[in-house]
UniProtKB/Swiss-Prot annotation:
Protein name: Phosphocarrier protein HPr
Record-linked PANTHER family: PHOSPHOCARRIER PROTEIN HPR (PTHR33705), PHOSPHOCARRIER PROTEIN NPR (PTHR33705:SF2)
SUPFAM superfamilies for this protein: HPr-like
General function of this protein: General (non sugar-specific) component of the phosphoenolpyruvate-dependent sugar phosphotransferase system (sugar PTS). This major carbohydrate active-transport system catalyzes the phosphorylation of incoming sugar substrates concomitantly with their translocation across the cell membrane. The phosphoryl group from phosphoenolpyruvate (PEP) is transferred to the phosphoryl carrier protein HPr by enzyme I. Phospho-HPr then transfers it to the PTS EIIA domain. P-Ser-HPr interacts with the catabolite control protein A (CcpA), forming a complex that binds to DNA at the catabolite response elements cre, operator sites preceding a large number of catabolite-regulated genes. Thus, P-Ser-HPr is a corepressor in carbon catabolite repression (CCR), a mechanism that allows bacteria to coordinate and optimize the utilization of available carbon sources. P-Ser-HPr also plays a role in inducer exclusion, in which it probably interacts with several non-PTS permeases and inhibits their transport activity.
NCBIfam families xrefs: PRK13780.1, PTS_HPr_family
Keywords: Cytoplasm, Phosphoprotein, Phosphotransferase system, Sugar transport, Transcription, Transcription regulation, Transport
This protein's GO CC annotations: cytoplasm
Length: 88
């Protein structure tokens, strides 16, 4: 299992557009990918799950990956979060 923690820096948090980008990125990997916020974990491949978390600016989030390409998945998702200016 791989994991990485981030602080959301986007002014509007993880709303529809960035949530869609994250779901699309997570869906490229065969590993299980989850995102955790305030103690609740959801499947990062589910747009409804991600949106249900209501992640705002300043939120501490953790992404977990587990499976055959877990390392590539965590690296790819980290790149998306940073490249899009969503989290650091």
């Amino acid at each position: 299992m791989e994991q990485a923690s981030f602080v959301v820096i986007d002014e509007t948090g993880i709303h529809a557009r960035p949530a869609t980008l994250l779901v699309q990125a997570a869906s490229k990997y065969s590993s299980d990918v989850q995102i955790e916020y305030t103690g609740k974990k959801v499947n990062l491949k589910s747009i409804m799950g991600v949106m249900s978390l209501g992640i705002g600016k300043g939120a501490d989030i953790t992404i977990y990956t587990e499976g055959s390409d877990e390392k590539e998945a965590i690296e790819g998702l980290t790149e998306v979060l940073k490249k899009e200016g969503l989290a650091e």
